[in-house]
Every structure is written in structure tokens, then in C-alpha cells.
Amino acid sequence: MERRRFLELSAGAVALSVINGCTRHKPSTDTTHRTLTASDYHATRRFAETKFGRIAYVERGTADGALFLHGFPLNSFQWRGVLDPLSVHRRCVAPDFLGLGFTEVSENQSVAPNAQVEMIVALLDSLSIKSVDLIANDSGGAVAQLFVARYPQRARTLLLTNCDTERDSPPPAVHPVIELARAGKFADEFLVPSVADKALARSENGALGSLCYSKPGNPNDEAIDYYLGPLVSSPLRKSQANAYAVALAPNPLAGIEAELRRCTIPTRIVWGTADNIFSSASPDYLDRTFPHSRGVRRIVGAKLFFPEEYPELIAEEALTLWRA
């Protein structure tokens, strides 16, 4: 099924307008830290043995922990541009969720958001990390909200980018993906063709590309293979990719608002304005809901997976939040 059809089935793309106070991002000229490559990830990937399975993760730095939660159908490679810069300040840990990336789990293991939260706790325990600064995107943002609601003592700060909210989870644009996954067809009909044809993957009809990225040529071939290759590598991995999508409904954040309103964790929201998957009202909703919100920064023209395209911006926002 095509991305265009997904949007048509979900009432079409939302018309976007310039929002007062939006920030136009200018790329940094700082070249002190480089973006990690797939080879770097393969060479340094570690596995934590937990009751949930072998959790794949990449780690950089020392000191206090910072945890990076990726989107769907991505994995920790999404954060390759921020790990080195922020490793000067934090022990940066970027895991692959259950059912995604290079994490290895059994056929019967749940990959639902609640299971992801408990997996994260087990991972942190295995690494002797008591508390973390959270940075999250997309479905990783839902997991982050569940984490701070359930384990507030284990989070110091929260940086949310375009992601689910209780009022928009799963968003209408994702409903057709979920239905396709329920039929057991998402991986075969959507992911497999995108791995075989990288130009298709980058197009508006592919698994990634112009719907999720604003910069032409993104994601590159290396990223597509790293993201999607593991998900189509076996019948089990295909079924787990389907299961991840299915588990996005019913709303995993139902009833969480009251808990988030009691949250004392400093929170910052950074939102791409060209995202037509999540509601444009969501950043203000999050700002109102978290009592210790540090406000919203809007990135004009940025789409769902913009943290991957603007790592220096994410690093800047993280450092500002951590120092506040």
C-alpha cells in the first residue's frame, strides 16, 4: 500500500501555515564531532541480556546517563549524529526497541509500548544507570511518556520531538499501516520493496522518504539498509515488525494525562511544522500538560524524523535543557 494512499485513507494531508514564533534552523558549522556510520554502529554495537531478549544498543561517553528512544520503523541509528557531540556531557545510550533494529527477542515476546517501557528499565538496570535524560521521537515519544509516568524517579529531563500524545495516538495517518500489519502484510508489501528499491523508499510512496524527511536524498542507502534490512531478514523479523505496528493500537497513552500533569520533570518540546502524521496541535497540548515545560520550539519545514536531519539542533536543545 502506498504512502499517498495512507494519507488519503486518513483524510488527507493537513494544510500547514507558518506559526508565530517558529524558528528557522540554520545548520551549524561545528565539525568537532562527526556523524557515526553504519560501520561504526556494527563495530560498537553491544547486547544486554534481559528477560525480554538480547537488547541491542550503542553507547558513547561517561557521566550521567542519557537515553535516546527512536521512531518506527527506525532504530538507534536515528541518533547517530548526536551521540558523539553529547557524549562529552553524558553517557549516551541508544537502544533498539523490541521487534526493531538488531534487538533479538522470542516469537512470543510482546513488542507493545508497555513492554518497551519495562525493557528500558531492565536495560538501565543491567547498565547500572539509575536515572537518565530522555530524548525521544515518534513512537519513542509515547514510550518516553509512559516511562516518566511510571518511573518518574528515573528521569531527570525529557526532550520530546514529534510524537504521540494521549489525544493523538495512534494518529489517523497510521491507521492504514496498522490494518495492513494486522493482515500480516505490512512488512512484505511495504518494507521489502523499500529495501529492494532505495529510490522507492525515499519517495512519497515508500516506507521512508518525503513523508518523513524534508531534505532531498534522505535517508541515504546506508540508513535504509540499516533501518529496514533487519526487519525483512526472516519470517520472524517480518512478523515482529507487523506486531510492532499492530501494538500501536488501541491508544497506549489512554488515561496518562492526569499522571503527566503531576510530572515534575523539566520538559522541552521541539516540533517540525511540516509533519502531516501527528497533529499540529500536539506541541501546545504537551506544553500545557507538563507543568514544568520549558516551552515549544517549532522548526519550520521539518518533518517527522527531523532529529536525524538536524542533529546539531537536538544537541543544542538537549544541552540547554540539561543546564537549566
Where are these regions (language model features)?
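Conserved HGGG/HGGXW glycine-rich cap/lid loop of the alpha/beta-hydrolase fold
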Residues: 59-102
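N-terminal export signals
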Residues: 5-24
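Flexible "cap/lid" subdomain of the alpha/beta-hydrolase fold that forms the substrate-access gate
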Residues: 26-45, 52-60, 89, 93, ...
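Catalytic histidine-centered segment of alpha/beta-hydrolase-like enzymes
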Residues: 302-310
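Conserved acidic functional residues
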Residues: 71, 138, 308-309
